[in-house]
Curated annotation (Swiss-Prot):
A Pfam family: LMBR1
The family this protein is said to belong to: Belongs to the LIMR family.
Top-level division of the source organism's lineage: Eukaryota
Species: Macaca fascicularis
Record's keyword terms, sorted: Cell membrane, Endocytosis, Endoplasmic reticulum, Membrane, Receptor, Transmembrane, Transmembrane helix, Wnt signaling pathway
Function: Plays an essential role in lymphocyte development by negatively regulating the canonical Wnt signaling pathway. In association with UBAC2 and E3 ubiquitin-protein ligase AMFR, promotes the ubiquitin-mediated degradation of CTNNB1 and Wnt receptors FZD6 and LRP6. LMBR1L stabilizes the beta-catenin destruction complex that is required for regulating CTNNB1 levels. Acts as a LCN1 receptor and can mediate its endocytosis.
Subcellular location: Cell membrane; Endoplasmic reticulum membrane
Region feature LCN1-binding, mapped onto this chain: 1-76
Quaternary structure annotation from Swiss-Prot or TrEMBL: Dimer. Can also form higher oligomers. Interacts with LCN1; this interaction mediates the endocytosis of LCN1. Interacts with UBAC2, FAF2, VCP, AMFR, ZNRF3, CTNNB1, LRP6, GSK3A, GSK3B, FZD6, DVL2 and RNF43. Interaction with LGB and SCGB1A1 is controversial.
Protein name: Protein LMBR1L
Membrane-topology annotation of the record: Multi-pass membrane protein
Gene Ontology molecular function: any one: transmembrane signaling receptor activity
GO biological process, one term: T cell proliferation
Annotated Gene Ontology cellular component terms: endoplasmic reticulum membrane; plasma membrane
Length: 489
């Protein structure tokens, strides 16, 4: 064998080994995410739906749960996509010729972006509708009852839904792009239809993030306050615990001996009051057992971190708005080739990259908090071991829409300079200056408004409670109803 043939063979072997290595790494990453999501979903599913007398119903619910687990794993992968790419770029910059990180390259990152895009399309368009129709189906009339009959009905329903959505998107694309090519795009299903449909879904997710993230940023302060032990400077915990235990014992006595009282009792109301008192007592015991560091330092530091992260997010978006007016390069754009390890995507180097990753995760958590806090989606909030299968499907779809829009959301707001890879950068609306500019301005305005309205009121209430001023005898003139009552007396 001649020398050129040996060189060609060695190059082919190297490409083959790199491709196999990328497949193994991608499979291991997905398997890890899948296991984590399966453990997470089993904590929220309703056990009665999987232990029913009808084996067909239990089998259908198990299949639907596996599809939801797959979708949630893709959603988690979409969340980790941009932070993993930013960190990988900084690692390659710091260790360019390290033997142990040769597996980390641009081809792997680009492949992960393409896989997330592909499976996001697959989950949103096929798997989740299939799971929903599968759980709701009963089989065609006259057919044999069982899983196979439900599969036939689900496939027919899914085909009809696919034709309906395909026709609607084709008509919409023909109206928007009024030319012959757009009308003939129905035949170019893979290259035009799916990216266009996913572009619409991504735009919907970005709009949803625009609404939920400012609301979540404002709600993060109250949510963190519920999770941490708040400082109380002028209060006696022992006295509050004694009063709570006394009230709980009195309510328990009334529930156990309802005949001892001559008034009619609302047992449901008494049970709710008892549950509230038990919850309050548990919180008081938690605060009593907390250390002085947790009581006096942990809560203020957490509030300060939230305030710094929120203020930094608004500041970065404000700077990005100015850059949009000055420099055309600030517009989000796609990048077909992943050229990693050449230049840092932050002006502050590795520290700036870490800040970008922290901000991306913080905004994603805030958007989820805002999503479940909004009145429109509050009914979707999952409950521990009491979430129906259809509700799990709805949660997985919403989380996938939010998470798949996170890379576009972060790049549109200028939180990172990392350009969108693969089909994520092919969205037509990303090149529209007015959409991007108005989106940034709306985010900055809504976030500032929510913070000013919520944070100031929360801080004022917390300071009043911290110093015990809420229990002080206030002047009667501050309360109109009370003043009128005293005047009548």
């Amino acid at each position: 064998m001649e020398a050129p043939d040996c060189e060609v063979l060695s190059v082919r072997e190297q490409l083959f080994h790199e491709r196999i290595r990328e497949c193994i790494i991608s499979t291991l990453l997905f398997a890890t995410l899948y296991i984590l999501c399966h453990i997470f979903l089993t904590r929220f599913k309703k056990p009665a739906e999987f232990t029913t007398v009808d084996d067909a119903d239990a089998t259908v619910n198990k299949i639907a749960l596996e599809l939801c687990t797959f979708t949630l794993a893709i959603a988690l992968g979409a969340v980790l996509l941009l932070p993993f790419s930013i960190i990988s770029n900084e690692v390659l910059l710091s260790l360019p010729r390290n033997y142990y990180i040769q597996w980390l390259n641009g081809s792997l990152i680009h492949g992960l972006w393409n896989l997330v895009f592909l499976f996001s399309n697959l989950s949103l368009i096929f798997l989740m509708p299939f799971a929903y129709f599968f759980t709701e189906s009963e089989g065609f009339a006259g057919s044999r009852k069982g899983v196979l009959g439900r599969v036939y009905e689900t496939v027919v329903m899914l085909m009809l839904l696919t034709l309906l959505v395909l026709g609607m998107v084709w008509v919409a694309s023909a109206i928007v792009d009024n030319n012959k090519a757009s009308r003939e795009s129905l035949y170019d299903f893979w290259e035009y239809y799916l990216p266009y449909l996913y572009s619409c879904i991504s735009f919907l997710g970005v709009l949803l993030l625009l609404v939920c993230t400012p609301l979540g940023l404002a709600r993060m302060f109250s949510v963190t306050g519920k999770l941490l032990v708040k400082p109380r400077l002028l209060e006696d915990l022992e006295e509050q615990l004694y009063c709570s235990a006394f009230e709980e014992a009195a309510l328990t006595r009334r529930i156990c001996n309802p005949t001892s009282c001559w008034l009619p009792l609302d047992m449901e109301l008494l049970h709710r009051q008892l549950l509230a008192l038990q919850t309050q007592r548990v919180l008081l015991e938690k605060r009593r057992k907390a250390s002085a560091w947790q009581r006096n330092l942990g809560y203020p530091l957490a509030m300060l971190c939230l305030l710094v992260l929120t203020g930094l997010s608004v500041l970065i978006v404000a700077i990005h708005i100015l850059e949009l007016l000055i420099d055309e390069a600030a517009m989000p754009r796609g990048m077909q080739g992943a050229s990693l390890g050449q230049v840092s995507f932050s002006k502050l180097g590795s520290f700036g990259a870490v800040v970008q990753v922290v901000l991306i995760f913080y905004l994603m958590v805030s958007s989820v908090v805002g999503f479940y806090s909004s009145p429109l989606f509050r009914s979707l909030r999952p409950r521990w071991h009491d979430t129906a299968m259809t509700q799990i499907i709805g949660n997985c779809v919403c989380l996938l829409v939010l998470s798949s829009a996170l890379p576009v959301f972060s790049r549109t707001l200028g939180l990172t300079r990392f350009d969108l890879l693969g089909d994520f950068g092919r969205f037509n609306w990303l090149g529209n200056f007015y959409i991007v500019f108005l989106y940034n301005a709306a985010f900055a305005g809504l976030t500032t408004l929510c913070l000013v309205k919520t944070f100031t009121a929360a801080v004022r209430a917390e300071l009043i409670r911290a110093f015990g001023l809420d229990r002080l005898p206030l002047p009667v003139s501050g309360f109109p109803r009370a003043s009128r009552k005293t005047q009548h007396q």
